[in-house]
Amino acid sequence: YFQSGVAVPLFSLYSKQSIGIGEFLDLIPFARWACFCEMNIIQLLPVNDTGAESSPYSARSAFALNPVFINVQSVEGSSEFSDEIREGKLEFDALENIDYYKISTWKRRILRKIYDLNYKSIKKDEVLLGWIESNGWAKAYCVYCTLKAQNGEASWKDWTNYKDPTEKDIEKLWVKYGKDCLFQAWMQCIAEMQFNAAVAEISKLGLRLKGDIPILINEDSADVWAERRYFSLDDRAGAPPDMFSYSGQNWGFPTYRWDVVEKDDFRWWKARLAQASKFYHAYRIDHVLGFFRIWSIPEREVTGIMG
């Protein structure tokens, strides 16, 4: 059975309706083009939240979507800031390259203004509250993002407090910083709705969306911060020396403590794959071999030689 498709990073897929970078809703016109070309599959690079990082493979959450891909004009309440949004679009459209950090910062600022203006109704939104309850990773992620912002985006390892939080700590912080935490959840809820709208159109056209799941996760992430027991912070993953790199590779990501993961019935990985299945008809794990063996390097090493 012959299959044809296209692999594309979402950030490169920007259209006339998007602002400075590809967005979830840009998948809709792209899917129509792919259908016209008689393609079957659209494959994306990871679309998880990377914070200030531009690499899609350096996520700060294995579950959360990247708010930079939200189409702000489609968000309820955005009309109050139409002039500011229009000015931002003109500025970013004039750039030759994607200014990832600037666009990400600008979008979060606009979304925060919309959120603050409509906070009284948003905090009672049953859809949002239901989304929080149905996503077990949400509170830890939202608290992590809130604390990270309060600490000038520094790594959790450099925070003064809450470097190793308990579940009670996370619940307490969720209440203490309720408005800021809810803002993070609200952005995620919007991102999911827009992504789901695009996926629905892709499915309607008879196409399939394929995702990309990096097997590793950034040390400075909500997952490593809140689920520390699953990760070995004394080790870094990489590759041994070969004909392409005499010193090997050190990717800088912690390895898994598979004995702990297994003892917990692979709960975290099951949840991660279930999250991906909400959006993708298929997905690639990069790289699946890492489930069986991986080059592990002592944390203090710079190269991959001593693995």
Question: Residue spans of the language-model regions?
Answer:
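Surface-exposed, flexible loop/turn segments at secondary-structure boundaries
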Residues: 50-52, 291, 296
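Substrate-binding/active-site clefts of carbohydrate-active enzymes
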Residues: 139, 200, 208-267, 272-275, ...
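A general structural signal for stabilizing positions within well-ordered secondary structure
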Residues: 33, 274-277
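A structural motif
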Residues: 39, 280-282
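GGW-centered surface loops in extracellular recognition modules
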Residues: 285
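Short acidic/histidine-rich active-site segments
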Residues: 288
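Acidic/aromatic-lined carbohydrate-recognition and catalytic surfaces
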Residues: 1-227, 261-262
